[in-house]
C-alpha cells in the first residue's frame, strides 16, 4: 500500500509548495512569513494511526518544516503536539476546527517564540525546538494515546 510508505505524501506536498507557497516567499524577500502547523484534534491522529499513515504524515510535516525553514524570511511554528489542547474534544467543532481562543494563544507564541521550529544550526539557541524534537513528541502522543478511553467518554 502506497500510504504505508514513509515518503507517500512527499511528491504531492512538494508540488503544492512549489506552486502555492514558495513562489510567494521567494517573490517577497522583505516580508516575514509565519507558517504554522495547526493543533488538529487527537481524533485526526486516531485516523492517521488507524489508516497506518503515521510515518507518512510525520515525514510530510518534516519535509514542509525543513523546506520552509530554508528561507531566511520564514518562521515555522508547530502546534500539533499541544496535548492539553488536542486531547480535549470540547476544544473542537470537528477534528480539525479548534476553538477560536487558540488563535490568540498561537499569535502569542508567534510573538514570544514558543512552539517555534528552529532552523538548522539554531539548535540550543533561544525558544523553540527542532522539527525532529516536535515530531518525536507528536509520534509519542499519537502512538500512546488511549483513544478507546476517549471514545468511551464521548459515547
Show which residues each predicted segment covers.
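Second-shell loop/turn segments in exported
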Residues: 6-11, 50-52, 92-93
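Extracytoplasmic/secreted proteins, especially bacterial periplasmic and envelope-associated proteins
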Residues: 16-20, 59, 63, 101-106
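Substrate-gating cap/lid alpha-helix
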Residues: 44-77
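Histidine-centered active-site loop/cap adjacent to the catalytic His
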Residues: 91-141
Amino acid at each position: 500500500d502506497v500510504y504505508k510508505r514513509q515518503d507517500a505524501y512527499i511528491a504531492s506536498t512538494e508540488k503544492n509548495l512549489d506552486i502555492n507557497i514558495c513562489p510567494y516567499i521567494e517573490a517577497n524577500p522583505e516580508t516575514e512569513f509565519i507558517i504554522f502547523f495547526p493543533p488538529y484534534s487527537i481524533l485526526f491522529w486516531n485516523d492517521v494511526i488507524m489508516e497506518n499513515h503515521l510515518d507518512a504524515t510525520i515525514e510530510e510535516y518534516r519535509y514542509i518544516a525543513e523546506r520552509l525553514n530554508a528561507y531566511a524570511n520564514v518562521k515555522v511554528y508547530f502546534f500539533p503536539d499541544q496535548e492539553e489542547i488536542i486531547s480535549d474534544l470540547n476544544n473542537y467543532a470537528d477534528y480539525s476546527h479548534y476553538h477560536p481562543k487558540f488563535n490568540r494563544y498561537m499569535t502569542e507564541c508567534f510573538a514570544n517564540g514558543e512552539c517555534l521550529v528552529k532552523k538548522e544550526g539554531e539548535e540550543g539557541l533561544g525558544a523553540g525546538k527542532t522539527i525532529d524534537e516536535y515530531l518525536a513528541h507528536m509520534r509519542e502522543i499519537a502512538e500512546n494515546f488511549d483513544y478507546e478511553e476517549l471514545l468511551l467518554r464521548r459515547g
